[in-house]
């Protein structure tokens, strides 16, 4: 079963945590051993700026390590697209050097922004991606436009960087499906 309460989810872990990282506040009802916390200094990205989020650093380092281990590292590096609350694009060289990135509101933030920033738009109750190019319903149009903006950001960054894209994050399944529908790998 899928747990939405982090406390309940943590109770079901079969093995103890050997390390953890977090962006933002830890809920007060979750108890984590501070000695197991991964900090930015623990992630060996070259030229990693001190302000980089631990989520971006770990995603970049994970993609870098997987590329090295699988012998699929592109000579020009990688582009990591972490499609979560924020779509973060992180570019790294083939030697693991941080090259920068881009940040765009994720799907949920885009939909929330339209809902909160306008008088008559409601947060879509149906999260199914519309198949039509220009949907009639407002909810479908909001979803289509938001997802298209994420796809466009990723596609353009891939074209500019000319490197493989590693996709992760909560919105990655819908983004992957739409990239595959366009024959983009």
Identify the function of each model-found stretch:
Residues 1, 78-81, 87-92:
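Short beta-strand scaffold segments in enzyme catalytic cores
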């Amino acid at each position: 079963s899928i747990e939405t309460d982090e406390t309940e989810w943590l109770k079901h872990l079969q093995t103890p945590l050997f390390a953890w990282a977090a962006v933002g506040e830890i809920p007060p009802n979750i108890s984590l051993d501070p000695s197991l916390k991964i900090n930015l200094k623990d992630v060996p990205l070259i030229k990693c700026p001190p302000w980089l989020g631990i989520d971006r650093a770990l995603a970049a380092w994970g993609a870098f390590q997987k590329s090295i281990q699988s012998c699929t590292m592109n000579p020009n590096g990688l582009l990591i697209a972490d499609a979560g609350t924020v779509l973060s694009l992180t570019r790294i060289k083939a030697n693991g050097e941080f090259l920068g990135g881009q940040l765009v509101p994720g799907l949920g933030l885009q939909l929330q922004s339209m809902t909160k920033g306008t008088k008559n738009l409601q947060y879509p109750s149906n999260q199914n991606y519309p198949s039509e190019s220009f949907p009639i319903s407002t909810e479908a149009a909001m979803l289509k436009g938001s997802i298209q903006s994420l796809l466009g950001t990723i596609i353009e960054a891939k074209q500019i960087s000319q490197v493989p894209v590693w996709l992760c994050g909560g919105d990655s399944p819908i983004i992957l499906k739409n990239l595959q529908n366009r024959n983009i790998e």
